[in-house]
Amino acid sequence: MSRPSKIVIASRESRLAMWQAVHVRDRLSSLNPGAEVVILGMTTKGDQILDRPLAEIGGKGLFIKELEVAMQEGKAHLAVHSMKDVPMVMPEGFVLAAISARENPRDAFVSNKYNGLDDLPAGAIVGTSSLRRESILRAKYPQLVIKSLRGNLDTRLKKLDAGEYDAIILAAAGLIRLGMENRIKSVLTAEQSLPAPGQGALGIELIDGAADMADVVAPLNDPETAHCVKAERAFSRALGGSCQVPLGGYAIIDNGQLWLRGFVATADGQEVVSAELRGNPADDEALGLQLAAELRAKGADAILEKLAHCK
C-alpha cells in the first residue's frame, strides 16, 4: 500500500491539545520519513462555551465535532483526542484506529496552600470540571464546597492562582505532558478517585474505511493500553456513560489479567455502586459489559433513573 506524501492532523488549539498533536506528528514523521506531517489547529464549541458545566451544554462530543467535519471535508486525514473526551459511541462514519501508550491516568490535587484533600478545612472551595470528580468529593468530603471549573489547563490554573479556589482537581496526565509536575501537590489513588474511562490515553480518529491511513497510524497503537481503554469504554457505554453520568472506570493489566474497576453515583455522592472483576485482556469489551451488568445487579439502574430525571 502506498504511503501518503502529506499527512494532516486535526487538533484543538489549546496548549495541551497541541502538545498531543505534536507528539503524534513527531512519531508519524519518524515512521514516515518521506512524508510531510502538519497540524491543523481548530477551536471547538467546547472550547468556546466556558460559562456552563459540560453536562449542561451537550457533553464530550463538543470537543471533537469540528475536527470530524475537517476530516469529512478532506482538510485533515486524522484527529488526535484525549480519550476521556471522546464520546462512548463513535459517530457514524468514524473509527478509533489507534490508542497510544497511557500517561499517568490518575487525578491530581493542585493547590497553593494545601498538600492534599485531607488537609482542606471545612468550607474550602474545590474546583472540578467533571460530575465524576464532583460526586466523589461530595461523597467523601461533604464539608467541602465544590464549584464548577471550566477552561483549558492554563485558564484553570490562573483561576486557582487568582484565589477563586482553594484547590482544584485536574488530570495528572495533562500537567505531566506540559512539564508542570511541580503544580501537583499529590496524585489521588484509584481508591480516592477512580479515573474516567480513557483518562491519560490518546486516541487517533479516522474516517471509517480509510485503509491507507489506518495502516499509517497502526504503529501508534499500544495493545495493553488499548485493551484497558476498550474495557473501560464498553463498561461506560453499557451504563449510558457521558458527561451527565458520574461514572468512573479504570483498568490495568496485572499479572497477565485485566483488572477492571468501576462505579456509578448520584451527583450528590449520596448513592454509590461499585464493583470490580478480572479476566483475559483479549476479552476487554466483554469484561466491560460484564462489570456493567454487575453494577446493574447491585442497584445501578435506580441511580441511572434518578440521573435521567435530573437532566
Curated annotation (Swiss-Prot):
Binds 1 dipyrromethane group covalently. The modification S-(dipyrrolylmethanemethyl)cysteine is found at residue 243. Keywords: Porphyrin biosynthesis, Transferase. It catalyses: 4 porphobilinogen + H2O = hydroxymethylbilane + 4 NH4(+). Its cofactor is dipyrromethane. It holds the Pfam family Porphobil_deamC. It is an enzyme of class 2 (transferase). The keyword Transmembrane does not apply. Pathway: Porphyrin-containing compound metabolism; protoporphyrin-IX biosynthesis; coproporphyrinogen-III from 5-aminolevulinate: step 2/4. The porphobilinogen subunits are added to the dipyrromethane group. Monomer. Tetrapolymerization of the monopyrrole PBG into the hydroxymethylbilane pre-uroporphyrinogen in several discrete steps. This is Porphobilinogen deaminase. The lineage of its organism: Bacteria, Pseudomonadati, Pseudomonadota, Betaproteobacteria, Rhodocyclales.
